[in-house]
């Protein structure tokens, strides 16, 4: 769970549009589908999930 310099642009993308940050980190997986759903249901849950995915992987 180390933060690298490549995570910084992913975090910026995650703040603007959370699915983009997840897509940059994991590609087109179930994480992206979950994040799109969370972003549609509420913007803040999408951001939280995106930050979790970026930090965890």
UniProtKB/Swiss-Prot annotation:
Pfam families: Pmp3 (PF01679). It is found in: Membrane. GO terms for cellular component: membrane. The keyword Membrane applies. The keyword rRNA-binding does not apply. The chain crosses the membrane at residues 3-23, 36-56. InterPro entries: PMP3. It is a multi-pass membrane protein. PROSITE patterns: UPF0057. Belongs to the UPF0057 (PMP3) family. This is UPF0057 membrane protein T23F2.5. It comes from Caenorhabditis elegans.
């Amino acid at each position: 769970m180390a933060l690298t310099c490549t995570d910084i642009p992913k975090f910026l993308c995650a703040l603007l549009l959370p699915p983009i940050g997840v897509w940059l980190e994991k590609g087109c997986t179930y994480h992206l589908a979950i994040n799109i759903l969370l972003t549609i249901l509420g913007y803040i849950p999408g951001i939280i999930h995106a930050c979790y995915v970026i930090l965890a992987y």
